[in-house]
């Protein structure tokens, strides 16, 4: 569990935040776009004024109006299409829940189709990084560090470029004026995750192992499992050992300077079982500056447009249903994401849509949705019993 805010205010509510280059906007005398049409015009301006941007904004290499990594979690551009059709866009796992409590698959909705058509139009206009469909994280970051992006997508812009030049792009009104942010599924359970640690039958001393696992939930240990540690020489550290206002031991986040927060964290954190609760902050650990920056800006930019009542929760399924879902996810998600990338890059969604829907059914989408619906209903019923 990693808590930082709750409900719609949880830091996990949005993963793939679009960051637009405010330095470039100012250079060209442009306002932050608020509609999909305005964004397209801004991207065109970035493309058509590449020489001016390169000269005045310190760009190393060709100007790239928009870049992303297709089907790559927080680096995917799906948040841009939330204003199309029904307003669900496309979540990371492709599920959403209507305000009536119906579980749907985002990648078979009409609004999704319209949004993908629009993204392909941006490709046709030469506004999208040609490598967006094949690049690895390291390539994506390297181009960002050379200040080449007008618009990019990630959890924290400091992982790609810097805080000074970028602002969060607000939720865009679609063709009919609809504005919505579809929150990430599981986000209301504060990063709750299952399977961080497993005791197998081959464990020779289960009592000792269980006692060791229990220590992973000690506050000072959990925050290190989650973020990283302190005192390592000749390398960036996440923390320094400090004291809270009461004189107790507290881990204080270090200033990482030009180091990427995610790269330092990945080098030091061990993950595994952990719990970081809201009431730990300023008692056992400081709130990290990058997370506070993200959370404050996320609330200011997106909170009012998080219109959906539900997200799909983190649920425990029977072994039988878990196995079924695993197989469905392999077939259905793989096919959906393969076609999504193809349609954004090459077009053809209108002509291939009916065949696509039929193939999704052949893969078992209706049964997949029925299983997900059953556990959503059980979860909602359990809330009423509390």
Question: Where do the PLM segments sit?
Answer:
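Helix-loop-helix "hinge/cap" segment bordering the ligand-binding cleft or interdomain interface
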Residues: 1-75, 97-143, 199-232, 351
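Carboxylate/His-rich catalytic cores and anion/metal-binding grooves
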Residues: 43-47, 57-96, 143, 148-168
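Extended hydrophobic/aromatic segments used for targeting, binding, or gating
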Residues: 89-108, 170, 178-182, 367-386
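Short, 15-30-residue, compositionally biased linear elements
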Residues: 105-115, 323-339, 370, 374-377
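Ligand-binding "clamshell"
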Residues: 160-184
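Mobile gating loops/cap/lid regions near enzyme active sites that modulate substrate access
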Residues: 187-192
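Conserved small-residue motifs centered on glycine
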Residues: 211, 219-342, 347
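Histidine-centered catalytic/metal-binding microenvironments
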Residues: 338-386
